Amino acid sequence: MEILRIEPTPSPNTMKVVLSYTREDKLSNTYKKVEETQPRFINQLLSIDGITSIFHVMNFLAVDKAPKADWEVILPDIKAAFSDANKVLESVNEPQIDNHFGEIKAELLTFKGIPYQIKLTSADQELREQLPQTYVDHMTQAQTAHDNIVFMRKWLDLGNRYGNIEEVMDGVLEEVLATYPESQLPVLVKHALEENHATNNYHFYRHVSLDEYHATDNWKTRLRMLNHFPKPTFEDIPLLDLALSDEKVPVRRQAIVLLGMIESKEILPYLYKGLRDKSPAVRRTAGDCISDLGYPEALPEMVLLLDDPQKIVRWRAAMFIFDEGNAEQLPALKAHINDNAFEVKLQIEMAISRIENGDEALGSVWKQMANRTI
């Protein structure tokens, strides 16, 4: 059994190791600790410092590392684990990984729809911040004697952010306070005490017109409108296009998110505006939307992002080219083969290899990995 190649995945803490051997049982297993009943090579990999789990299915392994572990140290050890009996790839000697501008997951802790804490999680950090005391007080007012607080509290996914985690926290706090102003808290408490919250579903949607949005001079109100906007249609594009010119980054970012929900090639020009935004967070979000839509027509625009100053944006561009690219993108990929960010360089190498070998992109594999049972 040999390692054919090692590929990055959308998760910075997971690498895909493609093997020359395909499982005949068509089963999958997740391994988290060394056990005698497991395959020897699995135990060898689990013995490597920094590896936390291995998912084995078909002809590949999804290897997870600890957030603070370094792929530059782990990858040669993975290859060495196969070297006793197998031919392996030569160890790569990549530059130091820059973790200062990475992907950050933002979540909001709520009880009966009343927010009271923010949590940010990056590859190597977790940061929490409680909302002002009045939010905690109103959350307490919404409790009844029969409430199971632990069961009824809920983490709301606010999506991904990008940048320095302390600066991101400041921005997310500003967004949350704009979306849930103090003046709205008594209404939320009243609703919490009157309604049956067994479903724990508290998101309210309200459609606004272009005229109503345009007449609003408070950016917090505009953001609140977008955050409570239902799934948009083509008729909403003028409003969202206007929001792309907003002075506040959270408004522009949310406009991009909503545009991405209109699953049509016709919205690509508006997403391209996001790719040129002065905020890296907006550029990356636009790249994510384009990647989710998967239209090859966006390749020329995504190729331009290989020159973006932020690695998290360049990585998204390289990943999209890996998924959708063809021989036309090879010159641009080869021109950027020496990118100074490890993840970007590796993704560019894989895109070149896939295109030159004529291999198909395995988008369905990412879904299988994301949905695997841990």
Swiss-Prot record:
Q: Which Pfam families match?
A: HEAT_2, Nfu_N, Virulence_fact
List the Gene Ontology MF annotations in alphabetical order: oxidoreductase activity
Which of UniProt's keywords are assigned here?
A: Virulence
Gene3D superfamilies, sorted: Leucine-rich Repeat Variant, Scaffold protein Nfu/NifU, N-terminal domain
Keyword Ligase among UniProt keywords: no
What PANTHER family has UniProt attached to this entry?
CONSERVED VIRULENCE FACTOR C, PBS LYASE HEAT-LIKE PROTEIN
The UniProt entry's sequence similarity note says: Belongs to the CvfC family.
- Provide the function of this protein: Required for hemolysin production.
- Name the record gives this protein: Conserved virulence factor C
